[in-house]
From Swiss-Prot:
It comes from the Bacteria. This is Uncharacterized protein in ATPase CF(0) subunits 3'region. CDD domains: ABC_SMC_barmotin. It comes from Rhodospirillum rubrum. It holds the Pfam family SMC_N.
Length: 173
């Protein structure tokens, strides 16, 4: 049983590591990263170390990266697991908060790619306007009167169609 467990764990580890390396490169627009089993030769007892080298920086463990670099690296790892074993839904709670606009753009492009390739639905909690603009549908909670919350939903694809239909160019055509 342990032999089978070790074999499956190593196989999954190698697949996740391969995806992680590729996704890190895409999310950072360069650099390199890998996963390492540490503290034991037995994969069932080993720890995991995340090593990363964002563009222009030396290879170091996750804890030594900046907050934004940590968030993007962790996102690459999460997405690597999803590519290895896709789930139908994933909730991401403000993972874009420490990211600058260029990284938010790459993050959103990666979400779209994963949705298209795995079929996973991502529920993204965010305050970042750029992330909201790249989503298909937005849900918001408002408080019209004290103590009474209401849910607002906007389908951005339909909203774009309405704007295009009402544009002056469309009226002249």
């Amino acid at each position: 049983l342990n032999r089978e467990g070790r074999s499956r764990l190593l196989e999954s580890f190698q697949r996740v590591d391969g995806h992680f390396r590729t996704l890190f490169l895409k999310l950072f627009g360069g650099g390199r990263a890998h996963l390492t089993l540490i503290e034991s030769d037995d994969p069932l007892e080993a720890g995991l170390e995340i090593m990363a080298s964002p563009p222009g920086k030396r290879l170091q463990s996750l804890g030594l990266l900046s907050g934004g670099e940590q968030a993007l690296t962790a996102t690459a790892l999460l997405f690597a697991v999803f590519l290895t074993n896709p789930a139908p839904i994933c909730v991401l709670d403000e993972v874009d908060a420490p990211l600058d606009d260029a990284n938010v753009d790459r993050f959103c492009a990666m979400l779209r790619h994963l949705t298209d390739t795995t079929g996973t639905r991502f529920l993204v909690v965010t305050h970042h306007r750029m992330t909201m603009a790249r989503m298909d549908r937005l849900f918001g909670v408002t408080m019209a009167e004290r103590g009474v919350s209401s849910l607002v939903s906007v389908d951005l694809c339909q909203a774009e169609d309405l704007v295009e239909a009402e544009s002056p160019a469309a009226v002249l055509a």
